[in-house]
Swiss-Prot record:
Chain's role: Essential for recycling GMP and indirectly, cGMP.
Gene behind the chain: gmk
Keyword Nucleotide-binding: yes
Name this polypeptide is given: Guanylate kinase
Protein's UniProt keywords contain Acyltransferase: no
SUPFAM superfamilies xrefs: P-loop containing nucleoside triphosphate hydrolases
Species, as recorded: Xanthomonas oryzae pv. oryzae (strain KACC10331 / KXO85)
Amino acid sequence: MRGTLYIVAAPSGAGKSSIVNATLARDPKIALSISFTSRAPRPGERHSEHYHFVSAEEFQGMIAAGDFFEYALVHGDWKGTARQSVEPQLAAGHDVLLEIDWQGARQVRQKVPDAVSVFILPPSRQALDERMRKRGQDSEDVMAQRLAAAREEMLHFEEFDYVIINETFDTAVSEMCAIFTASRLRRQAQQQRHAGLIQALLD
């Protein structure tokens, strides 16, 4: 059976990456697709682990070649998901998770209408501001731009299937795991996964 595509998006500072990493540690059945980006690595980030870091020229070349499943300009830098990291895995029956922004999520839903999408929100604007400032990686001007962009991004939460409020980290991770479990228990998925059993029960 074909794998399920999961989309997780959030404004910067909402804790998306931490929640995704903790969830994947609990649920090894899902593979994380590593995005490409034209921005420079931040302290502690490693190529091919956090992102595939490429130049803006290389990214534009990949766009021209049709290499991307989705891509978008985010905070002045390009980010995208390569087709090769998604389509073959889904066809082979593997579940794939995309950690992307709302623009990319919109593109993906147009291509894969049955993708399961999750949006993560902070518990308050104050919490969002504090979390972003704790990173200490950006100047005040860049921080102000990111905060304004985050508020704009949150307007798109209604486009998603599920919404998680990241007030308590462990609770948010448990809720993400529950979404994955519920997705696997949908009737269509169970009919495909247990076709033989269901047929035997009904004969």
